[in-house]
């Protein structure tokens, strides 16, 4: 383990940001000891903060990033680099994209630097059994070693699961759970924890809304459930909330409303995997809880940032 006094956090952030303006794909190879420091220090902060975060607006919320590091940099260029704005990320930082390491390292570095202004939740890909398969393990093994992947797993197992903004906006990676009756159930979950195959924690990271159903139904993913607009309305009414904000699904415009604007899906990886022609979006919540969207067009289109 590196002696933490030797590690220069500002230098790590500077090197990660140095590639702004370089050709997308240029890598930043931090020292293994520096990455271990990021994982260990961030883990301490996650554990010291609640598993169900209670946050205040104004805040900017981002959905899946999936290793698209240069798009993450574009999001910050658009929304303001921390601490210019407060941020909440909804999970899925690793896998599928080419630069999971830079992506997660910058997010962890900002978490350590600005622990009260920068927040990241756990996605279903911040789980060893998933990121072992979809790219992160291979990237760690290729660029560093398997032991480092295990260090990330220890860190991911301590990430918070959900956040409530000003008691009115409920955010998580996936969606609601048929097992969720009270917020206290989330608060009681002990960390470190893996993501189980079923139950509350699994659903919060895996479930999806479905406009064509009533109640709960099985999910095509083979994990968790889907839930209808009636479930969303009942939940918000019961908990006196206004909006559910989640990620987990690619949506064409980067954001998509559901159930009469009672739920919004955010996806922040434009041109996802190079296979989709989707935009990416970031949701800005102002002090009065008014939500607006900032759109990142797919980079390929050679357009600067569009707004809508």
From Swiss-Prot:
Q: Which cofactor does it need?
A: Mn(2+)
Q: Where is the active site?
A: 125 (proton donor)
Q: Which InterPro entries match?
A: Calcineurin-like_PHP_ApaH, Metallo-depent_PP-like, PP1_catalytic_subunit, Ser/Thr-sp_prot-phosphatase, STPPase_N
> Would the keyword Manganese be found if you checked this record's keyword annotation?
yes
Keywords on this record? Cytoplasm, Hydrolase, Manganese, Metal-binding, Protein phosphatase
> What Gene Ontology terms for biological process does this UniProt record contain?
attachment of spindle microtubules to kinetochore; centromere clustering; chromosome segregation; deactivation of mitotic spindle assembly checkpoint; positive regulation of attachment of mitotic spindle microtubules to kinetochore; positive regulation of termination of RNA polymerase II transcription; regulation of mitotic cell cycle
What SMART domains does UniProt report for this protein, alphabetically?
PP2Ac (SM00156)
The subcellular location is: Cytoplasm
Q: Any keyword Hydrolase?
A: yes
- What EC number(s) does its UniProt record assign? 3.1.3.16
Q: Which residues bind Mn(2+) 1?
A: 64, 66, 92
Question: What Gene Ontology molecular function terms does this protein carry?
Answer: metal ion binding; protein serine/threonine phosphatase activity
Reactions listed under catalytic activity: O-phospho-L-seryl-[protein] + H2O = L-seryl-[protein] + phosphate; O-phospho-L-threonyl-[protein] + H2O = L-threonyl-[protein] + phosphate
Enzyme class at the top of the EC tree: hydrolase
UniProt-listed PROSITE patterns: SER_THR_PHOSPHATASE
Family the entry assigns: Belongs to the PPP phosphatase family. PP-1 subfamily.
What protein does this entry describe? Serine/threonine-protein phosphatase PP1
Q: Which source organism does the UniProt entry give? A: Neurospora crassa (strain ATCC 24698 / 74-OR23-1A / CBS 708.71 / DSM 1257 / FGSC 987)
